Design a protein with these regions (language model features):
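Long, low-complexity, polar and repeat-rich extracellular regions
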Residues: 2-239
Length: 239
């Protein structure tokens, strides 16, 4: 079953959709400021596209404009959310309930706006999910506020932030979860990781070149590996 939506959302637009069934697809290509976009999928095997979408060859989810609010809810297993986001003052709420889901976002990969002053909240309940976030991949993204809340086992978080001052809070409950984080830029960043569960894997790099980085980890559990690198431009290091 295929459901395709391709709106042109203008200023002060409000967009909301609920899809109930398996193997649905949502296509959104939005341009314009101050849009409020709410997407919800219930069931398994669904896709919100962009990037390199599969199934019905979607592409994109492509959001261009400032002061946007994006609310994503995928409730079920084996769902996929993919997209490119361009613009300052982006507020994102992302909720995933289920197993084996996949989330991939690039924020301003072409250095169009700089994605300054963004606020992302990601809530995950389930296991063996994979999340990839590249924020400010070409440009410095100032004053990012990023919050992850993850409950489940075997999840992987991989995020790369090219930041100009950022706050990153990650709360994980469950065993065998992995955090791969790289923060780089000029104005430093704050990263607070709180984790409960065994067999965890942390690979954390803070690479601000002209300012201080701050890292706080509270971890409770047995087994696993932790690699932390803070480097402001000195000799190459590794674990």
């Amino acid at each position: 079953m295929l459901k395709t939506l391709s709106p042109s959302l203008l200023a002060l637009a409000l967009f909301s959709i609920v899809v109930i069934a398996d193997d649905n697809e949502i296509y959104v290509d939005q341009s314009g400021a101050t849009a409020n976009i709410d997407l919800e999928q219930l069931g398994s095997g669904n896709i919100i596209g962009g990037l390199e979408s599969t199934a019905g060859s979607l592409n994109p989810l492509d959001l261009d404009g400032s002061s946007l609010t994006l609310d994503i809810n995928q409730i079920g297993s084996s769902n996929t959310f993919l997209g490119d986001i361009y613009g300052d003052n982006i507020t994102g709420f992302f909720e995933f309930d289920g197993d084996s889901n996949s989330f991939t976002i690039q924020a301003d990969p072409d250095n169009t706006y700089g994605v300054d002053s963004s606020d992302y909240n990601v809530n995950v309940t389930g296991s063996t999910n994979t999340f990839t976030l590249n924020h400010g991949t070409s440009a410095l993204a100032s004053q990012l506020d990023l919050d992850w809340t993850v409950q489940g086992t075997g999840n992987t978080l991989a995020y790369n932030i090219n930041y100009d001052g950022a706050t990153n809070y990650t709360d994980i409950d469950g065993d065998s979860n992995t955090v791969n984080f790289t923060g780089q830029g000029y104005a430093g960043g704050y990263f607070y990781l709180e984790q409960d569960g065994g067999s965890r894997t942390f690979n954390i790099q803070q690479l601000s070149t002209l300012d201080n980085d701050y890292l706080k980890i509270l971890s409770n559990g047995t087994g696993g590996s932790v690699c932390i690198i803070q480097n402001d431009g000195g000799t190459s290091t590794g674990c």
